[in-house]
């Protein structure tokens, strides 16, 4: 190795170069919600969607806004204490920061589509809808455990289920609107979110496969 290669090897993290590379690729895909024009979505919302469609989209965007706040918090407060290499720390903090973009994206959609006093009630919908509330409680149940090993294993399983199976199922339903010529701005936000979540699920899966984070006790 030449001097530059040695320095890169050291600052990227000798043990977890894959995580540094994943972080860099993920950062190259950075985006902001306000890059997406919503004018046509507003027209669709007011003139083309049924009341049932609007109710469905309100529920999904309300839950996604809150759920991604909690995903961000999970990366910061639950995962990072286990990360003891620079590459893994960078990857996880990058994932957490992108979840804030997702929060902003769904909130931006709601702000553009729902106006007046109704907006606040929609943002709080997940707190009063029985199905959304039960899902919220189920995804956070492990956080009440004092058993560190149980907490860690369920944290990983919940992340892979929440960021993988559950999110992608709802993404498919949302993208169906754009596929049929409706809500294309929202569809763009969802498409970029899917691209991000591919990296997030892959990164967490690699942490498990490579035994990086199966150190039951967090770093002090």
Segments predicted by a language model, with ranges:
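Non-heme di-metal
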Residues: 1-220
